[in-house]
From Swiss-Prot:
Occurrences of domain TrmE-type G (ranges): 217-379
Cofactor or coenzyme needed: K(+)
UniProt-annotated binding residues for (6S)-5-formyl-5,6,7,8-tetrahydrofolate: R25, E82, K121, K456
This protein's name: tRNA modification GTPase MnmE
Top EC group: hydrolase
Binding-site residues for GTP, renumbered to this chain: 227-232, 246-252, 271-274
Keyword field contains tRNA processing: yes
Functional summary from the UniProt entry: Exhibits a very high intrinsic GTPase hydrolysis rate. Involved in the addition of a carboxymethylaminomethyl (cmnm) group at the wobble position (U34) of certain tRNAs, forming tRNA-cmnm(5)s(2)U34.
Subunit annotation: Homodimer. Heterotetramer of two MnmE and two MnmG subunits.
GO molecular-function terms, A-Z: GTP binding; GTPase activity; metal ion binding
Keyword terms of this UniProt record: Cytoplasm, GTP-binding, Hydrolase, Magnesium, Metal-binding, Nucleotide-binding, Potassium, tRNA processing
Organism name: Saccharophagus degradans (strain 2-40 / ATCC 43961 / DSM 17024)
Length: 456
């Protein structure tokens, strides 16, 4: 997919603000002439030159180190120049302006990584891993992003694609040469190979889901009546006072958010307004927002005040959750304030699809059990070695591929339908290839790279 462009791009590659070092990155056919203008010399490839950085008038703007990498041995696959000077925003802006005056244009967000992808220096999953590594919120997330950058995720996808290609060869041979004595479609060979691919796809999907959880985190919404202890639970999970806690009902009127980690698993904890009928217009707005957060939650923690015996029957008082299958499957009922009530869930067992936990947000009793529960319901394993970062689009692509594989197996088992199986295998291969960019619409590429930092 190697591409050539006549445009040379430039950007500040270091983070905004002041720092000890600031870097200007340049990529394209004019990188060497720009280096000659700025440095006053012709730099040796892959050699650190220390000297003055000057503008077109010969004015010294800064002093620092210049590195020149001729194509194709560079990050982008093009001629690349890096100017490493002092990290002041004024200095960097002046130097960037001099680079632009010498023939470059300002880069779009993610354009350096996009050129690296187009020049086959890395695939799409690796390019996305660069952004994931920068944005990692924990050590484990950073390690898995680095694994993806090194190609571990891509290699697994390539292996699946290669197996699908060989499987398609078997199937299409049986279709094209039906007179042959060996019928690959009915002798079990194709079905056996297909089952192997399905099993391996399941394994990759499980790893991708773990990687996406580390990258994106789990959205946990705390819901319940006013004064059920929602804000106290937020503070307990965050281990600091985020929300105001009082005995006055309706203290929390808006959504409060806090980002925390449990053994490396990122969580977005959201405290919401107490759910009730209220004549107060402002409180009504907060309650509407609460339901909006509940709708998009990965997990709902419904708090029940155990000091009020009239509220203990969840099915009676919260049919909005228990009778709604979409809510019930992601619902955990928290019986709070057990330090005051002496409540025990052993007296309130049921066959409900949701889990119940006793807890005291005030004293912390049951908090460790809740944390372990959250890790369990999301399938998080804090001791997992290796692994790779993944995004929701990757999971969707693998799920789509798996659906086609399962449909193809059904066609094979019921009808020995070679043509239909071949089409399902082709579709599965295309979905998997979207992950690495081997088969990707241009509009998706634009969307992915536009979310990157400028200079990356």
């Amino acid at each position: 997919m190697t591409t050539q462009t006549n445009e040379t791009i430039a950007a500040i590659a270091t983070a905004p603000g002041r720092g000890g070092v600031g870097i200007i990155r340049v990529s394209g056919p004019k990188a060497l002439p720009i280096a000659q203008h700025i440095l006053g010399i012709t730099p040796k490839p892959r050699y650190a030159h220390y000297g003055d950085f000057c503008n077109a008038n010969g004015d010294i703007l800064d002093q620092g180190i210049a590195l020149y990498f001729p194509n194709p041995h560079s990050f982008t696959g093009e001629d690349v120049l890096e100017l490493q000077g002092h990290g002041g925003p004024v200095i960097l802006d002046m130097l960037l302006d001099a680079v632009v005056q010498a023939g470059a244009r300002l880069a779009r967000p993610g354009e350096f990584s996009e050129r690296a992808f187009l020049n086959d220096k890395l695939d799409l999953a690796q390019a996305e891993a660069i952004a994931d590594l920068i944005e990692a919120s924990s050590q484990q997330a950073a390690k898995q992003a680095l694994n993806s950058l090194k190609g571990e995720f891509s290699n697994k996808i390539h292996e699946l694609v290669e197996q699908l290609i060989h499987l398609r060869m078997y199937v299409e041979s049986a279709i094209d040469f039906p007179e042959e004595e060996i019928d690959f479609l009915s002798d079990g060979i194709v079905e056996g190979k297909l089952n192997d691919v399905i099993d391996q796809t399941d394994a990759v999907l499980a790893q991708a889901q773990q990687g996406a959880l580390l990258r994106d985190g789990m959205k946990v919404v705390i819901a319940g009546r006013p004064n059920a202890g929602k804000s106290s639970l937020l503070n307990a999970l965050a281990e600091k006072d985020i929300a105001i806690v009082t005995n006055i009902a309706g203290t929390t009127r808006d959504v409060l958010r806090e980002h925390i980690h449990i053994d490396g698993m990122p969580l977005h904890i959201i405290d919401t307004a107490g759910l009730r009928d209220s004549p107060d217009h402002v409180e009504q707005i907060g309650i509407e927002r609460a339901w909006g957060e509940i709708e998009s939650a990965d997990r709902i923690l419904l708090l029940i005040d155990t000091t009020d015996n009239s509220q203990l029957d969840v099915n009676v008082h919260w049919p909005e959750f228990t009778s709604n299958a979409a809510y019930a499957k992601k619902l955990t009922v928290i019986y709070n304030k057990i330090d005051e009530s002496g409540f025990s869930t052993t007296n309130h067992t049921s066959d409900a699809p949701y889990q119940t936990l006793p807890l005291s947000a005030k004293t912390g009793a049951g908090l460790d059990t809740l944390k372990a529960h959250l890790k369990s319901v999301m399938g998080f394993q804090s001791t997992t070695e290796g692994g790779f970062s993944a995004r929701r689009r990757h999971i969707h692509a693998i799920e789509q591929a798996q659906n086609y594989l399962l449909t193809g197996r059904e066609q094979l088992q019921l009808h020995t339908a070679g043509e239909l199986l071949a089409e399902d295998l082709r579709a599965a291969q295309n979905h998997l290839s979207e992950i690495t960019g081997a088969f990707t619409p241009d509009d998706l590429l634009g969307k992915i790279f536009s979310s990157f930092c400028i200079g990356k």
